[in-house]
Amino acid sequence: MPPTPKSPLNIIFGAMTFGRAGTAQARVTSLEECAAILDIFQAHGHTEIDTARYYGAGTSEEYLGELNWQDRGLVMDTKFYPTAGKNMPEDDGAPEGGWNHGEEHLRENVGRSLEALRCEGVDLWYLHGPDRTTAFEETLRVVNALYKEGCFSRFGISNYMAWEVAQICEICRREGYVMPTVYQGVYNALHQTVEQELFSCLRYYGVAFYAYNPLAGGYLTGRYWRGMQDGEVERGSRFDVQGGEVAGTGVSGEVLE
């Protein structure tokens, strides 16, 4: 009998740091370490894993596939981030100009995710962020087709503005497409902007909110303290100041000083 979770909340493990050494965000780079982390997570009664095509240039998904997540009884969520028009690192297979949310790129990346994860479909698949170079109507038509093809059981969106959420939901209602049922966004004691407008929008459309970065990249734990020197912060960690912003927190370094 699996252990009973101690928290009534749905705790999801984010696998952003799983992946091949040298790829973006990857800090847990051996399969043995990844397996040990999953063992501890499951020992506490949790089963849902969150990854993304972008994490580790696709190697986070590959590691989870190699770790036979299905045989472990895990539930898998993944995402596809559009890099077109953004100054971001690309994976080896990215086209010139980056990925967008047009049909060709959506289908290619869903296929790549499923191949890496070694499965025919995942539980929850997200549009990881807005692509404002492609009409939502086109994107959502393809998302609905992928849903009908069994690529995922639930559709989610992440990092969209409240007005974009409303627009997406209205298009889906009008066209009879699968509705987004989950929104993943940053939320913690330092970053509460979602309370102002987004929460009301999600409540209106019946969309659940999944909070990522609840501990502000570790700032709200005992791991960091006032007076730490730059060399004491692990390079590439969620609390490493990069370009004036604390990686993974959405908060400028000045705010935390």
Description of each model-found segment:
Residues 1-75, 148, 229:
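N-terminal binding-site loop/beta-alpha segment at the start of enzyme catalytic domains
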Residues 4-26, 77-97, 121, 126:
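N-terminal small/glycine-rich loop or linker at the start of catalytic domains
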Residues 9, 47, 120-123, 153, ...:
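Short acidic/polar active-site loop segments enriched in Thr and Asp
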Residues 13, 41, 49, 64, ...:
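Conserved, mostly hydrophobic/aromatic
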Residues 27-42, 99-118, 136-138, 165-170:
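Short, acidic/polar
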Residues 40-46, 115-121, 146-151, 205:
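A structural motif corresponding to the C-terminal end of an alpha-helix
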Residues 132-257:
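Beta/alpha (TIM)-barrel catalytic core signal, keyed to glycine-rich beta->alpha loops juxtaposed to Asp/Glu
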